[in-house]
């Protein structure tokens, strides 16, 4: 039975565009933009106007789902509030008022109530005259007519999803989330909690034509439940995770989720058996509501931010200038005096998924002219390779720059390996070079066209080197561990290295022009030639200048320590230095880039535009153990207190879409290729922005020790081109 005209409720759901919501505005923006909730989200306002109100004798409470309808209207589903009737409210978001109510009944007209229907998920179907509503009690997904609220049909639910003892689901932990794609062809039903035996994993069922066709594995953050989904299309979703801790309050986080290339886990008895991270849906944080400005909100119980409450509903709204979208949230007060029915309005940036555009591979055994190398290595065979080696291997690339200044095509490159075999005591026969290479993304091959040798014929290096008594004084991996490379405004090259750490300047042919420049703050690594007897190293081994960016005009360098200094109490800090090329000195200015976890390192950096930097953040794992390989955007001009830089994840290199099959056909046992492409190589150490939103990424293969792509086979050097929408 409905208390509004049939036309009112049906018309309200005829389309799914929500217009602007007139809510309490967030505090005015000032320096630092206090409305910001993060790099891709800001709070536009909130409203408590619906809290503890009634409509036509019903309590407006327990609103657990929000489905967009026509104009400024949305439909809100009530959960199990006592013995009251199950119902859907027609909410005018602009006026912050309920305009109508539809009571949900069985096909025979008998009412559903809070005792037998726990409404949690709601979507409006294509016609606008029917809705699908999920109930946690059984669980179920039922179709109702909006005109009279009568049940029309129900969708099948796999038996194991039934609440125990009939199935493996826990009470009140079932279909909390329900979403449909913009074309209404796909429906997603998400489990708030795990099935018995799934550990902490959640399942999302994919329906097509009213039938379940597959299941996805999803991980929430610890102690959080999956309470809502928004389907964006193209296998992309938004996921709302929510939790509550007594005496502390709520946690509310929204993630961008990708199902690209995700496998069907219907036949997996327990999600705890999934060892490959690619078997789980990928997710990136869009907004943590605790980071939004309180904006005058009040809470009726302890909260880490008074803006927070039991948010359970989410709906995507209209487009805003600048490409952002409105995102509406609603909290469920559970009919409690200590909770609030609150509407939120956010502006969010939802970027399209990153796509693989090109891939070129240089064989691990593409030995180059030069003396036999690897003579100091253990002669045992590693990944099918036995030292010594017939010439000079290319052990991947730790830095890649254009072969010609200003070229952004990615077709002609100057690519630099590091010190060879990883240590001073095993790399004396590895010559330091930068190779001129032409990757061919059509044939997936790399043409090595020549190289420049780094050398010190003018004796600028003040400490002993391996080839000290030769004419050319070719530099080796026992002299420097070169990791980053930049070209200045004169065409000279600057090498960032890790033994010092030093900055080393050469001319365009590789000849050293001046003594290496040490850190301005006295920092030294254990391998530093400058380390005095008894002096304590403050830069860990192999944690020097792995990354270095250069300004567009070539006059400023930004070398970055790969890891934290040993004397730094903040082990997540990675120091960004500033070096004035014209003055030939450090400026004394530094910034702090904070990695997500102390174990993570900075692999490389490059300038995007102005003083905006693109960095590699990575773990030290490879293959299926790889968890963090990502590109992060920051801006030196947007540094906060104490020079701490903002950060935004631009792309997860473990989750790149490959719709065109660039990475296929797969080689035998090759990991990480196909519709979902991954870059699971241990040392992702080169990043180069190209034209538009394209980025080139390459790896150091730690020859011959890495086998992240094909187990038991030494990793090749891979150069990939990725299209990253919204990069800049």
Please name every model-derived segment.
Residues 32-728:
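Sequence/structural signature of beta-propeller domains
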């Amino acid at each position: 039975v409905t208390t509004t005209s049939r036309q009112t409720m049906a018309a309200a759901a005829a389309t799914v565009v929500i217009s602007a919501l007139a809510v309490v505005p967030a505090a005015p923006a000032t320096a630092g933009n206090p409305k910001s909730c993060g790099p891709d989200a800001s709070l536009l306002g909130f409203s408590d106007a619906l809290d503890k109100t009634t409509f036509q004798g019903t309590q407006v409470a327990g609103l657990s789902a929000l489905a967009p309808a026509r104009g400024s209207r949305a439909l809100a589903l009530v959960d199990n509030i006592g013995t009251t009737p199950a119902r859907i409210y027609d909410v005018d978001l602009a006026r912050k008022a309920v305009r109508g109510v539809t009571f949900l009944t069985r096909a025979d007209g008998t009412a559903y109530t809070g005792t037998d229907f726990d409404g949690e998920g709601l979507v409006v179907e294509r016609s606008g005259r029917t809705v699908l509503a999920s109930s946690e009690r059984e669980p179920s997904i039922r179709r109702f007519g909006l005109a009279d609220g009568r049940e029309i049909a129900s969708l099948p639910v796999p038996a194991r999803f039934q609440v125990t003892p009939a199935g493996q689901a826990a009470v009140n932990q079932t279909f909390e989330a329900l979403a449909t794609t913009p074309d209404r062809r796909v429906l997603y039903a998400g489990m708030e909690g795990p099935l018995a035996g799934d550990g902490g994993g959640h399942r999302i069922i994919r329906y097509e034509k009213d039938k379940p066709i597959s299941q996805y594995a999803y991980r929430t953050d610890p102690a959080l439940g999956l309470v809502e989904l928004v389907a964006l299309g193209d296998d992309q979703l938004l996921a709302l995770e929510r939790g509550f801790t007594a005496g502390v309050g709520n946690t509310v986080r929204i993630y961008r989720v990708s199902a690209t290339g995700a496998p069907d886990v219907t036949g997996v008895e327990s999600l705890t058996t999934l060892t490959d991270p690619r078997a789980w849906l990928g997710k990136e944080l869009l907004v943590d509501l605790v980071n939004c400005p309180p904006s005058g909100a009040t809470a009726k119980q302890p909260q880490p931010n008074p803006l927070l409450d039991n948010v359970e509903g989410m709906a995507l709204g209209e487009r805003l200038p600048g490409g952002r979208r409105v995102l509406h949230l609603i909290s469920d007060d559970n009919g409690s005096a200590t909770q609030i029915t609150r509407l939120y309005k956010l502006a969010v940036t939802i970027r399209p998924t990153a796509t693989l555009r090109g891939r070129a591979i240089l064989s691990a055994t593409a030995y180059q002219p030069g003396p036999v190398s690897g003579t100091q290595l253990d002669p045992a065979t590693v990944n099918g390779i036995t030292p010594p080696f017939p010439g000079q291997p290319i052990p991947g690339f730790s830095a890649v720059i254009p072969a010609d200044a200003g070229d952004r095509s990615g077709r002609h490159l100057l690519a630099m390996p590091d010190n060879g075999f990883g240590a001073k005591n095993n790399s004396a026969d590895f010559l330091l070079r930068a190779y001129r290479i032409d990757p061919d993304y059509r044939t997936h091959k790399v043409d090595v066209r020549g190289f420049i040798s780094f050398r010190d014929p003018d004796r600028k290096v003040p400490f002993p080197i391996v080839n000290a008594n030769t004419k050319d004084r070719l530099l080796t991996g026992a002299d420097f561990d070169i990791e980053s490379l930049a070209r200045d405004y004169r065409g000279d090259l600057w090498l960032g290295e890790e033994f010092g750490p030093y900055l080393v300047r050469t001319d365009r042919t590789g000849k050293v022009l001046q003594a290496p420049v040490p850190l301005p703050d006295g920092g030294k690594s254990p391998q530093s030639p400058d380390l005095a007897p008894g002096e304590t190293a403050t830069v860990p081994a192999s944690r020097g200048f792995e990354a270095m960016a250069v300004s567009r005009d070539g006059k400023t360098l930004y070398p970055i320590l790969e890891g934290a200094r040993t004397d730094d109490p903040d082990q997540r800090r990675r120091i960004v230095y500033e070096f004035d090329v014209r003055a030939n000195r450090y400026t004394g200015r530094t910034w702090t880039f904070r990695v997500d976890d102390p174990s993570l390192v900075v692999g490389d950096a490059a300038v995007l535009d102005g003083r905006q930097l693109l960095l590699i953040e990575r773990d030290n794992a490879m293959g299926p153990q790889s968890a963090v390989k990502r590109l992060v955007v920051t801006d030196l001009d947007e540094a906060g207190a104490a020079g701490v830089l903002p950060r935004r994840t631009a792309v997860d290199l473990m989750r790149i879409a490959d719709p065109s099959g660039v990475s296929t056909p797969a080689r035998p046992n090759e990991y990480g290729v196909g519709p979902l492409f991954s870059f699971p190589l241990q040392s992702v150490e080169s990043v180069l922005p190209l034209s538009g939103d394209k980025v080139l990424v390459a790896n150091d293969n730690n020859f011959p020790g890495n086998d992240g792509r094909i187990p038991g086979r030494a990793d090749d050097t891979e150069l990939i081109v990725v299209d990253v929408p919204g990069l800049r």
